[in-house]
Amino acid sequence: MAKRVTGPEIEKLIQLLAKVPGLGPRSARRAALHLIKKKDQLLGPLSNAMGEAYDKVKICSRCGNVDTVDPCTVCTDAQRDQSVIIVVEDVSDLWALERAGAMNAAYHVLGGTLSPLDGIGPDDLNIRGLIDRIGEGGIRELIIAVNATVEGQTTAHYITDQLQGLDVKITRLAHGVPVGGELDYLDEGTLAAALRARTVI
């Protein structure tokens, strides 16, 4: 059994960092050590930024984006075409599409995809909010930009079925987004091309 070589505070930091997606125990130890070595330049400012984020971050009640204001900056941006809504699984997908810079539209974050095997149904996602937004009127196009996974495609078909009979054009990202691929991992050029070549469902 390995002996503990640090105090409980450092161990706690390592354990919490290891819960961050993309960081395992080994990477978390390296990150913690780097932060501690750069205590004044990194650890202190990071601690302050995390405290501020904890106090100020909100989930937009309209679209599900993460921001410090509600409604969020995207929803209140008068320069955006609010008649076009891009539907994404997660906030990271919204950020990825914004980096691509191909469209200046509104967004709607579902908070995941339908997955009966994992017990995730329509009521567990922000689908009702989307239907309500479209029901308010003024939406001419819905771009379904979910990942090209089985769950993503199931979600896209479910949304399309729910919107039958409404006067809104429903499109999806063009093929080219690889099957099984996730938007957050694609380069900006691929995302921009996929948005431009979207097709009607």
From Swiss-Prot:
MF terms (GO), sorted A to Z: DNA binding; zinc ion binding
BP-aspect Gene Ontology terms: DNA recombination; DNA repair
Give start-end positions of each zinc finger (C4-type).
Answer: 60-75
Where does the record place the Toprim domain?
83-178
TM region(s), chain numbering: none
Keywords from the UniProt entry:
DNA damage, DNA recombination, DNA repair, Metal-binding, Zinc, Zinc-finger
- Cross-referenced InterPro entries, in alphabetical order? DNA_Rcmb_RecR, Rcmb_RecR, Rcmb_RecR_Znf, TOPRIM_dom, TOPRIM_RecR
| Superkingdom of the source species | Bacteria
Family stated for the protein in its record: Belongs to the RecR family.
Role this protein plays: May play a role in DNA repair. It seems to be involved in an RecBC-independent recombinational process of DNA repair. It may act with RecF and RecO.
Task: Name the chain's protein.
Answer: Recombination protein RecR
What organism does the record attribute this protein to?
Answer: Rhizobium etli (strain CIAT 652)
